[in-house]
Amino acid sequence: MLIKDTIFYRPDWRWHIFLKYLTNNLSKYNCLEKIIPSEYSYKDSTYGSKKSKKNVNLCTWGVTHKKRIQFARAVCINSPKYSVLNFLIIPNTIYNVPFFGVDFVSLPNIYLLVLDFQPSLKIQNQYNNQLLEKLIKLKNHCHSSLPLAEEMSVDVARFFSPGAIWSKLPKEERSDFLIANQLYTSFKEYLDLYLEILFESKEVNIDLQKELINGQNNYLNYRRDNDPARPMLSSLFGKEFTESLIKEVLFTT
């Protein structure tokens, strides 16, 4: 099933404009869709007690690029209580470029919003001052409208840049406006800047490539072991499917 034919492209799914922008822009860079095993590419299921069963839909979509992108994938979830867009670009390690990470989650009473160029090396070894200044300026503009959430723990913060957007919003009309306007604008600015940098980057030497491979593996292994979405996914799809999805699709190249 094509992602354009799913519920995730319809206006009633919370993150549809973000997903459309992702897919359209990656296609402009001649990215090729990657075949995802059918058990993960689209799934309809139910969750909850026998008396109050609820439907849930999951779609996993991905692309690659012959030189620049090892794997870029989106995981989309739609249900009465949860709506999720999780997106990650894993760049080719011949370029010294961070990950691009998005985690937009709608819970029963709150929105959790994360957007960042996530480092695979120490900040000073992967971001020049010009890039950091651009990111921090974009972040500060976004957070002039969206509240900044609490400080991340040291263990988690090492996988985020100084330009990370991190916010929590209550489920109310004002938040809908902020998501459709300020967050969407920031999302487009971040993705456009990221793809520009990725596709203009020069190849690095073998020693740095080895560091990048190790750095990417450290992040992916950490996420496989500590993915904060694991409890939610398990409640919606069961533990066995969740573990398989996390280990075989979400955090692998």
Swiss-Prot record:
GO MF term set: cobalt ion binding; phycoerythrobilin:ferredoxin oxidoreductase activity
Domain of life: Bacteria
Alphabetized Gene3D superfamilies for the sequence: 3.40.1500.20
Root EC class: oxidoreductase
InterPro entries noted in UniProt: Ferredoxin-dep_bilin_Rdtase (IPR009249), Phycoerythrobilin_Fdx_Rdtase (IPR022827)
Enzyme Commission code(s) on record: 1.3.7.3
Catalytic activity: (3Z)-phycoerythrobilin + oxidized 2[4Fe-4S]-[ferredoxin] = 15,16-dihydrobiliverdin + reduced 2[4Fe-4S]-[ferredoxin] + 2 H(+)
Alphabetically ordered keywords of this record: Oxidoreductase
Gene Ontology process terms (BP): phytochromobilin biosynthetic process
The keyword Heme is annotated on this UniProt entry: no
One Pfam family it belongs to: Fe_bilin_red
Family to which this protein belongs: Belongs to the HY2 family.
Biological role: Catalyzes the two-electron reduction of the C2 and C3(1) diene system of 15,16-dihydrobiliverdin.
Name under which the protein is recorded: Phycoerythrobilin:ferredoxin oxidoreductase
Species assigned in the record: Prochlorococcus marinus (strain MIT 9215)
